[in-house]
From Swiss-Prot:
A GO CC term attached to the entry: cytoplasm
The protein's name: Alanine--tRNA ligase
Family designation: Belongs to the class-II aminoacyl-tRNA synthetase family.
Function: Catalyzes the attachment of alanine to tRNA(Ala) in a two-step reaction: alanine is first activated by ATP to form Ala-AMP and then transferred to the acceptor end of tRNA(Ala). Also edits incorrectly charged Ser-tRNA(Ala) and Gly-tRNA(Ala) via its editing domain.
Subcellular location: Cytoplasm
E.C. code: 6.1.1.7
Gene source species: Saccharolobus solfataricus (strain ATCC 35092 / DSM 1617 / JCM 11322 / P2)
HAMAP family: Ala_tRNA_synth_A
Biological process (GO), any one: alanyl-tRNA aminoacylation
Required co-factors: Zn(2+)
Length: 900
């Protein structure tokens, strides 16, 4: 959609003598006070010329630029609110915070809940990876991490705050009065914005070739069929670039110098590369507006311009700028890594962790291309020292950040050992596509840049896309939200049936200890029963649905409830049989299986206790990745970058049991979701993100508070005690804890005692003597194993001395029969095939082990053997085969002859 000219013809522009002009280069309309201006002052229509503008403001650091912006709007009636983390954990569809408006999506922007203040101002650290390949090349125009300073106003039908004129007036006042930019240098370029299903006209504020802010007026919803429907809630969504404000006031040769100051020179030094010539950098930066990274020709033209301007050889220009761009990339990436990890990201192969690992590996790749020996964590440590006052969480989580980065580098170095074999596999392809390179990166973690050298050795050419990492990030930057109907295990026709039914009153929230109730039947569909109210808890939040009885008191018929489910606000009782004596409108009595429910309540409550204990022991990066509560045990999956030690597990267990012994009150609360977020932070969403204006929180006094819709005990003492019974790494970056509490702990102890008694009986000892008896048995086994090794050596020597090879076409064929020791077989076959042109086969009934020397291929022999039936296969020089029928030694030799 293109907005009409009237959308931009603001009273503010008319009253303040702004003129509407059309840019001679891009043909875009813009507003300016300069009658003579012909260009929109945005790149690539002009070079960067803000260096030449007389700006009255003193040079501002990022910190000073941020504070100047926030204070300016605070003085003008805006409430300053704290930024959210760079991980968008209040969203189920997005991993990273890409803009300040994300802080308020989807619930504030949809009108479901009010904003925390109106109007408000915030400076939101943001991360966008779609430009990751362009970082450094454009001297700071593209960054992966930046601060979006923003003032927002939410205009409701019954409450107008401010709109286009006031927003434009604020921008003009801030840039001209606060920063001292001459009015005639300020330009408002007409544009259109769309994102997140919303749209509206916008104005891009440009000064001297640099876009400093975007003023978006969100006023349309985009329907599925592409129509634009006016929104009732009209939102002022602005974005001012804090780093660009610092750059325009400092007039440094690159944005990196404005952002990082002396850290730029320190990074060149630590990485071990020469600093770029200052004059070259200044000239290159001035012409950098001409660079369109998606068009490699513009990079070439830019370097030719620099070469011509300075009279320097083009090769020298390219080498200097390439080297500087790589150091700038590492500056940018290490800050992004620091912020991601400080806010709790754990590098992994999926979700947000994948994106974190992508940035880390790209930084490692660049260091490798620069042939630098510096450890990445040393550079991240420098960033922590530089930003610790701006972002206190980076200092608080310093140990985790550095440990995780070093571990990732060690893993990356192991991955690089695979480069030759991966290159060999790729070299067999007739053409290497972008999809092949992405597949290799996704599967093996090997950057294509580092495959290039190996492939060149094999004289294989391939086209490496400039935006490779952006393409990879795009595939992983969002998460698919499941439809509510896809999450439940109920028939579709039932889901249609319940759409007409009223919400079920949740008695389990009024009294979690209620065991029975009376309710009215609202719907019956086969063996599914819906009541007006219930104390049966439906499956959710990892807690199993309740079971119990529905009693028809008219007929005294009792129906077993085998499960309870929920769709939206309707609770469905799943019966073992169809309720033949019950009809809609009847009153029935429900009784839950209380012993089962109480076990679930204990396991659900102790899950919260253990999660908080894990955070205390391991760090703030711990995040719930999944949970399940059954009557028998609880299960909690947490994000963590390495295996837990025995000591860490004990500490978690000790903290949890201490909280149980403390008899801490456990209290459910209901709060406005935005109020809850502002008070407790987004960590309340560890168990999932509810879609409601009011959310239910569970507070364990002075220990934990989290959004949770489950059932819990009212005091930690009711849990009794907890024991962690299993810890395992279930996938990259995820650790699973399993535990038992209350009666389930007693069951576990009894089962363990029974196993110990059985083991003692088997080896003929008592439980208290079991450890010493086992030690004696192991010593005896070890002695016998040593004897077996000696006997194997004797057998091996005898066989090797006695075996005579068959000669076929200059090849030696050895046949071993009747040796059933598989390990010994492998060792003998290996020794026999240590010289070229040798095949060794061990036969045991219809099972064959085959080995060849390195200059031969085992697969041809296997192929010939399997022609007569059977199965098997191998790799390289070794194979296992099971023939469909036993063959004589002579028959096998004959088959081998054919294969040769």
């Amino acid at each position: 959609m293109k907005a009409s000219e009237e959308e931009y013809k603001l009273n503010f522009f008319i009253k303040n003598d702004f003129k509407r002009k059309i840019c001679k280069s891009c043909q875009t309309p813009f507003w300016t006070k300069d009658d003579k201006k012909e260009y929109c002052s945005d790149i690539p229509c002009t070079d960067y010329y803000f260096f030449d503008i007389n700006i009255k403001s003193q040079p501002l650091t990022v910190k000073e630029a941020r504070e100047k912006f926030l204070s300016f709007f605070e003085k003008r009636g805006h409430t300053r609110i704290p930024p959210k983390p760079v991980l968008a954990r209040w969203r189920e569809d997005l991993y990273l915070t890409i803009a300040s408006i994300v802080d308020f999506q989807p619930h504030v922007t949809s009108g479901l809940v009010p904003p925390p203040a109106n109007p408000l101002v915030v400076s939101q650290p943001s991360i966008r990876l779609e430009d990751i390949d362009n970082v450094g090349v454009t001297f700071g125009r593209h960054l992966t991490t930046f601060e979006m300073a923003a003032h927002h106003a939410f205009n409701y039908p019954d409450r107008y705050v401010y709109w286009k004129d006031e927003t434009t007036a604020y921008a003009t006042e801030f840039f001209t009065k606060e920063l001292g930019i001459p009015e005639e240098e300020l330009n408002f370029k007409e544009s259109w914005w769309e994102g997140g299903g919303n749209a509206g006209p916008c104005l891009e504020v440009t000064v001297g070739g640099l876009e400093l802010a975007t003023l978006v007026f969100m006023q349309y919803k985009i329907t599925d069929n592409g129509d634009y429907i006016p929104l009732k809630l009209k939102i002022v969504d602005t974005g001012y670039g804090v780093e660009r404000i610092a750059w325009v006031t400092q007039k440094t040769p690159s944005a990196f110098h404005a952002i990082y100051g002396n850290l730029v020179y320190k990074f060149f030094d630590k990485i071990g590369v020469a600093y770029i010539d200052e004059t070259l950098l200044k000239v290159a930066s001035r012409f950098a507006g001409k660079i369109d990274p998606d068009n490699p020709d513009t990079i070439k033209i830019h370097r030719q311009m620099v070469s011509k301007e300075l009279g320097i050889d083009i090769k020298n220009v390219e080498e200097e700028l390439d080297r500087a761009a790589k150091v700038f990339q590492i500056l940018d990436h290490t800050k992004t890594i620091m912020l991601m990890l400080a806010d709790g990201l754990v590098p992994s192969n999926s979700g947000e962790g994948y994106l974190g690992r992508l940035v880390i590996r790209r930084a490692l790749k660049v260091l490798r291309l620069l042939k630098s020996d510096v450890r990445l964590y040393e550079l991240v440590k420098e960033q922590i020292g530089f930003w610790k006052e701006d972002f206190p969480q980076v200092l608080k989580n310093k140990d985790y950040i550095l440990d995780a980065v070093e571990l990732e580098q060690q893993r990356f170095e192991k991955i690089l050992e695979k480069v030759p074999s991966i290159a060999s596999t790729l070299a067999r392809k007739s053409e290497i596509t972008t999809e092949d390179l992405i597949q290799v990166y996704d599967s093996n973690g090997v950057p294509p840049d580092l495959l290039e050298e190996e492939l060149k050795k094999k004289r294989v050419k391939f086209e490496l896309p400039r935006n490779f990492y952006a393409l990879v990030a795009k595939r992983h930057q969002t998460s698919t939200i499941k439809n509510v109907y896809d999450k439940v295990k109920l028939p579709k026709d039932l889901l249609e049936y319940i759409t007409t039914l009223q919400p079920t009153e949740k008695l389990y929230y009024k009294d979690q200890y209620m065991r029975s109730f009376e309710g009215k039947v609202l719907g019956i569909y086969k063996n599914y029963l819906i009541l007006d109210k219930t104390t049966f808890y439906p499956e959710g939040g990892g807690q199993l649905g309740d079971t119990g009885l529905i009693i028809d008191e008219k007929s005294s018929k009792r129906y077993e409830v085998v499960d309870t489910q929920k769709v939206n606000d309707v609770i469905i009782h799943v019966l073992k049989e169809e309720p033949s004596t019950i009809k809609v409108g009847d009153n029935v009595r429900g009784e839950i299986n209380w012993e089962r429910r109480y076990r679930l309540m204990r396991h659900h409550t102790v899950t919260h206790v253990i999660l908080a204990a894990a955070k205390k022991v391991l760090g703030d990066h711990i995040w719930q990745a999944g949970a399940e509560k059954t009557p028998e045990k609880g299960r909690l999956d947490i994000t963590h970058h390495k295996a837990l030690t025995e000591e860490e597990v004990k500490l978690i267990e000790n903290y949890a049991n201490s909280v149980i012994s403390d008899r801490r009150p456990v209290k459910p609360l209901e709060m406005n979701r935005m109020e809850a977020e502002m008070k407790y932070g987004v960590s309340i969403y560890e168990g999932g993100v509810p879609n409601s204006a009011t959310i239910r929180l569970l507070e364990i006094k002075d220990w934990d508070i989290e959004s949770c819709g489950g059932t819990h005990v009212s005091n930690t003492s009711e849990i009794g005690a907890v024991k962690i019974i299993n810890v395992e790494r279930i996938q990259d970056g995820i650790i699973r804890l399993e535990y038992v509490a209350g009666p389930a702990l007693v069951d576990y102890i009894r089962e363990t005692e029974a196993k110990i008694a059985e083991a003692s009986k088997i080896i003929g000892t008592s439980p208290d003597q079991l450890p010493s008896r086992l030690r004696r048995i192991l010593n005896e086994v070890e002695k016998k194993n040593n004897l077996i090794i000696q006997y194997r050596r004797i057998v091996e020597t005898e066989l090797l001395n006695s075996l005579k090879p068959y000669e076929i076409n200059g090849n030696k064929i050895y046949i071993i029969e009747g040796l059933n020791d598989e390990e010994e077989n492998k060792e003998i076959l290996r020794k026999l095939t240590s010289t070229d042109n040798t095949i060794a086969i061990s036969i045991s009934d219809n099972r064959l082990q085959i080995a060849t020397s390195k200059n031969m291929r085992v697969d041809k022999i296997v192929e010939e053997l399997l022609k007569g039936g059977g199965k098997g296969g191998g790799k390289g020089t070794f194979a296992n085969v099971i023939l469909s029928s036993k063959k004589s030694k002579e028959e096998i030799i004959d088959i081998v002859r054919k294969s040769l």
